[in-house]
């Protein structure tokens, strides 16, 4: 299939412009581990998020990273491991479409991407390589068992699209030009995977491709201003493994769905009832 994107074309066997790309048949996710990528100072929200997750998946393991924030070691037990690491998020907040090519910002982006891969590897190892993983944050509430379309290796709601602005479009043409140089990859034009729920072995395959082709993929940071945010970076890793993000109707977001409290969605993003005013990155 040839996809026409203005002055560019992309060849693939699916239409990446379509948001709802799933099948009707689903399977339950039972074997899953949780990786909290950055909990910073969201103490109450983190505790509530973990409590909710354990209510649904009591046997699942959790790898918890505090990137320069509070010490959560008091939460450790046989199913939860805590790691205090460097804050790689606050510097990214200051990067935008005007300054992302500055050498110092390039270094920040690359450092953040490397940290995400390291945390994924550490988390999967602690969780004993479950069939599925969930990379998440404290503003995510898992309030029910999650299922996946039979063909899916990565779940999300694909809410973001590359043609949102011309600069985004140009950036994703650059990203996909890099991906096209590597055998077995697919294009990426839609994404929005928060939390990231994916198939562990497929992720590891994508990481392997990324590391083997790092001379090419190190240039991702030069194409777009935020390629390292994990809702985009992980779909890129799955694209390297030949797998698209597949739309899940089990996701909802509090800021987009005023009826989220009474809806049946098991995965809730932007859940901030336990946040306080000093819970955010930046100068706090």
Predicted regions and their residues:
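N-proximal low-complexity "stem/linker" segments adjacent to membrane-targeting elements
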Residues: 1-48
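C-terminal catalytic/acceptor-binding lobe
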Residues: 3-5, 219-284
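Short beta-strand/turn micro-motifs composed of small residues
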Residues: 36-40, 64-68, 136, 156
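Short acidic, S/G/P-rich loop/turn micro-motifs used as interaction or catalytic elements
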Residues: 40-44, 70, 140-142, 202-205
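Short, acidic, metal-binding catalytic loop of nucleotide-sugar glycosyltransferases
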Residues: 51-60
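Active-site-proximal specificity loops/subdomain of glycosyltransferases
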Residues: 67-129
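Short beta-strand-to-loop acidic/aromatic patch adjacent to the donor-nucleotide binding site
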Residues: 130-141
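Conserved catalytic core of nucleotide-sugar-dependent glycosyltransferases
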Residues: 141-223, 227-229, 235
């Amino acid at each position: 299939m040839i996809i026409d994107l203005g002055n560019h074309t992309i060849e693939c066997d699916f239409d990446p412009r379509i948001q709802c790309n799933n099948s009707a048949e689903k399977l339950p996710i039972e074997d899953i581990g949780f990786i909290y990528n950055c909990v910073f100072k969201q103490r109450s929200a983190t505790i509530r998020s973990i409590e909710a997750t354990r209510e649904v998946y009591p046997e699942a393991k959790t790898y918890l990273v505090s990137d320069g924030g509070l010490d959560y070691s008091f939460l450790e037990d046989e199913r939860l491991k805590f790691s205090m690491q460097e804050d790689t998020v606050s510097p990214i907040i200051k990067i935008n479409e005007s300054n992302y090519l500055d050498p110092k910002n390039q270094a920040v982006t690359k450092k953040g991407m490397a940290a995400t891969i390291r945390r994924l590897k550490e988390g999967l190892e602690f969780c004993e390589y479950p069939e599925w993983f969930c990379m998440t944050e404290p503003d995510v509430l898992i309030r029910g068992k999650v299922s996946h379309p039979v063909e899916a290796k990565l779940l999300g709601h694909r809410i973001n699209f590359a043609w949102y602005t011309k600069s985004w479009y140009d950036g994703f043409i650059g990203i996909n030009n890099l991906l096209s140089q590597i055998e077995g990859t697919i294009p990426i034009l839609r994404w929005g995977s928060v939390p990231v729920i994916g198939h562990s072995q497929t992720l590891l395959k994508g990481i392997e491709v990324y590391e083997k082709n790092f001379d090419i993929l190190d240039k991702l940071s030069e194409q777009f201003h935020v390629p390292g945010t994990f809702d985009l970076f992980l779909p890129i890793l799955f694209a390297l493994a030949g797998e698209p993000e597949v739309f899940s109707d089990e996701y909802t977001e509090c800021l987009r769905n005023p009826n989220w409290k009474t809806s049946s969605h098991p995965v809730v993003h932007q859940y901030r009832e336990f946040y306080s005013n000093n819970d955010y990155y930046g100068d706090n």
